[in-house]
Regions:
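Pyridoxal 5′-phosphate
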Residues: 1-296, 305
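Low-acidity, Ser/Thr- and Arg-rich intrinsically disordered low-complexity segments
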Residues: 298-345
Length: 345
C-alpha cells in the first residue's frame, strides 16, 4: 500500500488548510481515524447497539459477541496467552492506575521500592506517586545518558531486595528511545519482580509479542493507534488477574451480592465495572485490522527512515540520538514557507 493510498483511507485529509493539503505530524499525541473505524462506529449504533453482558435479547447477544470478538483479536494481535489477560479500560492512563491501585493495595508496604526511569510520562509516574503518599513507598529513578538511553548495568544497581515493581516506557514520547525491555524483564525474573510497560508509544510502532517481551503488564492507548478516544487496554498476566483485587465496584464485575457478602467475577469482568465503551471496543477491531495491513504503522524502520530523511534535508537537527535504538529522535525544524522538506508534502 503506497503512502498516498494510505492517506486516502483517512477522511480528514480530504480538506485543505490555507489552500494546502493537510499534513498531520501529531500522531504520537493522537492519531487520525481511518474511514473503516468511523464507519464501524456508525454501523454498530445503527444496527447492533446494546449494552453488553447484561441482557439476552437479540441486540444484546450481537453486541456482546462483537465486544468479545475484539478481545480475541487483541489477544492475537499482542500474542497474549489467555483472553482473560485482556482488560478494556478508558485509556492507558487508567490501565496503569488500575495496576498501581490494585497491586499497590495488596503487595506494597512502607519502604518498598518502585523503580521507574527519568523518561516516564506523567501517566507512569503520578499513579506510583499516589502509592508513595498512601503507603509510604519509595520511588527510584533510573537515570539516562545525554542521548536518552539507560545503562543496563547502572539500572541493575538500582534494584534491591525492596524493589517490588519496575515500570517504564516502551518508547519515549519525548526522545523516541526504544527501551531494552527484554534485558530488563530477564533481570526482573531472576528476582521475582513484576514489570509494567507503558506501551502508549510502543504499541502503534511495534509488532507486539507480550510473551516474548516477558512483561507482566502492558498498557495500550487505543486513540494513538487509529482507534476511538476513551479506550485503552491493559494486558496482565493470568497470574496477576487471578491474584489482584477488583479496581472499581459496580455492575458486571460481581458474581453475587448479598447484604453482608459480595463475590466477584473472574477476569476480565472483575476489572470492567459498569457500562463499557461498547461501540469504541467494537470499532477498535477495525483499527487493528488497519494497523496490521498498513506497511507503515507497525514497522519502526518506516518511522526511522522518515526521521532520517528529514534530518538529511539539512533543514532540521536532532535534539536526541539518531541511532537505530531510537524510533524518532526529537528534532528542531527551521524552514520558510517556501522551503518545506519534500518528505512533508
Amino acid at each position: 500500500m503506497k503512502f498516498d493510498n494510505i492517506k486516502s483511507k483517512f477522511p480528514i485529509f480530504k480538506q485543505k488548510i490555507k489552500g494546502k493539503p493537510l499534513i498531520y505530524l501529531d500522531s504520537a499525541n493522537s492519531s487520525q481515524k481511518p474511514k473503516a473505524v468511523i464507519d464501524e462506529i456508525s454501523r454498530f449504533y445503527e444496527t447492533e447497539y446494546s449494552n453488553v453482558g447484561r441482557s439476552v435479547h437479540t441486540l444484546a447477544v450481537k453486541a456482546t459477541n462483537k465486544f468479545e470478538e475484539t478481545r480475541d483479536i487483541v489477544k492475537s494481535y499482542i500474542n497474549a496467552q489467555y483472553r482473560e489477560e485482556i482488560i478494556f479500560t478508558k485509556g492507558a492512563t487508567e490501565a496503569i492506575n488500575l495496576v498501581a491501585s490494585t497491586y499497590g493495595e495488596k503487595f506494597i508496604k512502607e519502604g518498598d521500592e518502585i523503580l521507574v526511569t527519568e523518561l516516564e510520562h506523567h501517566s507512569n509516574y503520578v499513579p506510583w506517586h499516589y502509592l508513595r503518599k498512601k503507603k509510604g513507598a519509595v520511588i527510584k529513578f533510573a537515570s539516562v545518558n545525554e542521548n536518552g538511553e539507560i545503562d543496563i548495568d547502572e539500572f541493575k544497581k538500582q534494584i534491591t531486595e525492596k524493589t517490588k515493581m519496575i515500570a517504564f516506557t516502551h518508547i519515549s514520547n519525548v526522545t523516541g528511545t526504544i527501551m531494552p525491555i527484554k534485558k530488563v524483564t530477564d533481570l526482573a525474573k531472576t528476582k521475582n519482580i513484576p514489570v509494567l510497560i507503558d506501551g502508549t508509544q510502543g504499541a502503534p510502532h511495534s509488532v507486539l509479542d507480550v510473551q516474548d517481551l516477558g512483561c507482566d503488564f502492558y498498557a495500550i492507548s487505543c486513540h494513538k493507534m487509529y482507534g476511538p478516544n476513551g479506550l485503552g487496554i491493559l494486558y496482565a498476566k493470568k497470574k496477576w488477574v487471578d491474584e489482584l483485587p477488583p479496581y472499581q465496584g459496580g455492575g458486571g464485575m460481581i458474581n453475587e451480592v448479598k447484604k453482608d457478602e459480595i463475590t466477584y467475577a473472574d477476569s476480565p469482568n472483575k476489572f470492567e465495572a459498569g457500562t463499557m465503551q461498547t461501540a469504541e471496543v467494537v470499532a477498535f477491531a477495525k483499527s487493528m485490522n488497519f494497523a496490521h495491513e498498513c506497511p507503515l504503522g507497525c514497522k519502526p524502520r518506516s518511522a526511522t527512515s522518515l526521521s532520517q530523511n528529514i534530518i538529511a534535508s539539512a533543514l532540521v537537527s536532532p535534539l536526541s540520538s539518531n541511532s537505530s535504538d531510537f524510533l524518532n529522535p526529537l528534532i528542531s525544524i527551521e524552514y520558510t514557507p517556501s522551503s518545506i522538506p519534500s518528505v512533508f508534502t
